[in-house]
Design a protein with these regions (language model features):
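N-terminal Rossmann NAD(P)H-binding glycine-rich loop of SDR-like oxidoreductase domains
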Residues: 2-27
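Mid/C-terminal beta-alpha module of Rossmann-like enzyme folds, strongest
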Residues: 4, 195-261, 269-329
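NAD(P)H-binding glycine-rich loop region in Rossmannoid oxidoreductase-like domains
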Residues: 37-102, 112-119
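Substrate-positioning beta->alpha
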Residues: 91, 155-156, 175-196, 204
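Conserved beta-loop-beta element that borders a ligand/cofactor-binding pocket
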Residues: 111, 132-162, 166, 171
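A conserved amphipathic terminal alpha-helix motif
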Residues: 290, 294, 408-436
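Glycine-rich portal/gate segments that line the openings of hydrophobic small-molecule binding cavities
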Residues: 326, 332-380
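Beta-strand/loop substructures that line and gate deep hydrophobic ligand-binding cavities in soluble
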Residues: 373-419
Length: 436
């Protein structure tokens, strides 16, 4: 029987990419999250064992760690606000102790890249001290300290994406001239996977980055070039951290507490000083920054997006995610799925091919249409019909990927009308389904 792998922080970004790779490699996977039902929208949900547990409640850890060979520690507490450093260290120590008792053979931890001997932000210091807390136990720990991670859905990349798309002139403090060594998210996953099979990395700390060193402002300018946008960076002598985190929280998908911690972490260089990882894991072939951006942009489609919003917590949501503005609605319909889907196809026919073309169709379940309207961005509308415990549910999701400032203005200025139209649309589909 394949060894059991535990992935903590399963609702997070890295875990969402790591778990499919583990499953594809034939591993048995168990996920650990405080609220496992938030994972229901993930494609792999039914192929893994899901255990509710919280490192801040040590008594919950034993069931999650029982029978585990290797555990990935992908937990952070940035969203919890002040005092997160103490919580992260306490949680890591509790996990290390519980892993030792459970007989876990290996812990793999993903942290952040900074010089621990230099002047670094509380966020980066917390990442380093979390690794030290995990090593407090007797279970061997492999720690990867990553520079800026580039990939669709990465917090760092989404900050770059949304701010560069929105602002013709991007303001930034002096540290925007600091150096980083951005690494493609697929290479991060490559390293995390390689640590499972390559015993030479056990018990070591590795700094990981991509093949290029670039200033933070250059990352935005290169993104703009690949998107065909004309952008400038304006270096400002001083911008208060609270003001920057407020702006990032407003303009991007990154919540303000996380933005506050993350921006503080950008105030220093993030480059690899010790490249032993290249010798220990030569099987990992590094991807260039431009290629990483192009891969991320190629995923700008509803067919590739991670459905983090599809859970049991609310049936109407608007959010920013992976380059999209998203309007999500879900209602219960008193009709069979086939009848609901028949009404959906009639509505789609009414729109006509001049307005929309069919992107994806799964009979009686899913219809995804791509907009052909001339707008400053790309749009899709998707309907899904599902049968859950003798009840039929209809979900309607609108995706809009803005291109440049005009795309943002288009979405926000039409907000009042958009809300009315999308509400009317799903309600009419439901109403017509019941009289079909």
């Amino acid at each position: 029987m394949a060894k059991l792998i535990l992935v903590t922080g399963a609702t997070g970004y890295i875990a969402s990419l790591l778990i499919p790779r583990l499953l594809d490699s034939g591993r048995r996977v168990r996920t650990m999250a405080r609220h496992p039902l938030r994972l229901k929208g993930r494609n792999w949900f039914h192929y893994v064992e899901n255990i509710p547990a919280d490192v801040m409640t040590p008594s919950t850890l034993a069931p999650a760690l029982h029978g585990v060979d290797t555990a990935y520690y992908l937990i952070h507490s940035m969203a919890s606000g002040q005092g997160y450093t103490e919580r992260e260290i306490a949680g890591a120590r509790a996990f290390a102790s519980a892993a030792e008792v459970a007989g876990v053979k290996h812990i793999i931890y993903l942290g952040g890249l900074a010089d621990p001997e230099g002047h670094i932000s509380p966020h980066m210091l917390s990442r380093i001290e979390t690794g030290a807390a995990l090593r407090h136990g007797r279970v061997p720990v492999t720690e990867f300290r990553a520079s800026v991670i580039i990939g669709s859905g990465s917090i760092s990349f989404e900050m770059i994406r949304f701010m560069t798309e929105l602002l013709p002139i991007v303001p930034g403090p002096a540290w925007i001239n600091n150096n980083s060594q951005p690494i493609a998210v697929q290479n991060v996953i490559d390293y995390l996977m390689a640590a499972l099979d390559n015993p030479n990395g056990s018990g070591q700390v590795f700094e990981i980055g991509g093949p290029e060193i670039a200033q933070y402002k250059d990352l935005m300018m290169r993104y703009a070039r690949l998107r065909g946008l004309k952008r400038r960076v304006l270096v400002v002598s001083y911008i208060p951290l609270w003001f920057m985190s407020f702006g990032v929280g407003l303009m991007t998908p990154v919540p303000r507490p996380i933005a506050h911690a993350l921006i503080g972490g950008l105030s220093h260089h993030s480059i690899v000083k010790h490249d032993k990882v290249l010798r220990v894991f030569p099987e990992v072939k590094l991807v260039s920054f431009d290629e990483a951006i192009q891969i991320a942009l190629a995923r700008l489609s509803p067919r590739h997006i991670e459905r983090v919003w599809d859970d049991d917590e609310g049936h109407t949501k608007t959010l920013k995610h992976e380059g999209f503005f998203i309007d999500y609605r879900k209602i219960k319909v008193s009709a069979e799925p086939e009848k609901v889907f028949n009404v959906i196809t009639k509505f789609a026919d009414h729109f006509g091919t001049r307005q929309f073309t069919v992107d994806t169709v799964e009979p009686d379940h899913l219809l995804l249409l791509r907009s052909q309207l001339k707008t400053p961005g790309e749009g899709w509308i998707e309907w899904q019909v599902s049968r859950i415990v003798n009840s039929t549910y209809l979900t309607q999701t609108v995706f809009f990927a803005p291109r440049g400032t005009a795309g943002f203005l288009y979405w926000y200025l039409l907000s009042p009308f958009r809300a009315i139209i999308f509400y009317w649309l799903i309600k009419n589909i439901a109403r017509n389904s019941m009289v079909e």
